[in-house]
Each structure stands twice: as structure tokens, then as C-alpha cells.
Amino acid sequence: MEAAVDDRQLLAKLGAGRLSGDALARELGQTRAAIWKRIQGLRAAGVEIDGRAGDGYQLQQRMELLDSASILGALPAPLAERLDSLEVAWSVGSTNSELLRCSAPERGARVLLAERQTGGRGRRGRAWA
């Protein structure tokens, strides 16, 4: 998988309520500057984060992130048994490209889902709408 900072922990904290940059830095074991950079990256990716000086940060809307265990649990047993693996990545260029880099599974299908694709494209090279 493409190396990318996994911001799921940060998003979970921001979704739980308003927290200061200092509190986020302490809880995630990072500097306040690193938290600020990650928040700016999330904003650039389209995540709406409310931030007020002296009041902290909070998601403007609740986000439900992909969870492989929940997805597998919701699949009918005969379908789940046909899967070799089901992985959830934070950010990849293209799920299709990532899967093509892997060797074919000996049995079943390999599934890769991503919260964010930075280089994905539609059929025949069309851009995503």
C-alpha cells in the first residue's frame, strides 16, 4: 500500500467533540504543529473541520469510516467465505492499481477499499465526477 498518514484516529477524536490542538497532540503523541498540518491536509481533502482559536477543533459533520470487520460481518456467509481478504486502507492512489501489484490469491477474491483515492479514475480514463 502507498505510504500515507492514517488519520482515522485523528478523525475519531475530532468526531467525539471539540478538542484543542494541545489536547489532540498529547492524546496522539505528536506535536501541535504536526496536528495542525494533518488538519490542514484533511481540509484539503474535503473534510469539513471547524477550528476556532482558543476553542479547538471539531468535525462539522459526523463521519462513518469503513471498517473491515463490520463489512465482513454484514456479508452473507457464502459470500464472505469466497473472499481471500478484505482490507481497508486510509489513502491509496488507486485501489485497482494496488490490487494489480499484489500476487493473485490462491483462492477467492482479494478486496481493497479505501477512504480516499488520490489517483483513481473512472472507466476509459474518465475523471471521477
Predicted feature locations:
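N-terminal lobe of the biotin/lipoate ligase/transferase fold
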Residues: 2-129
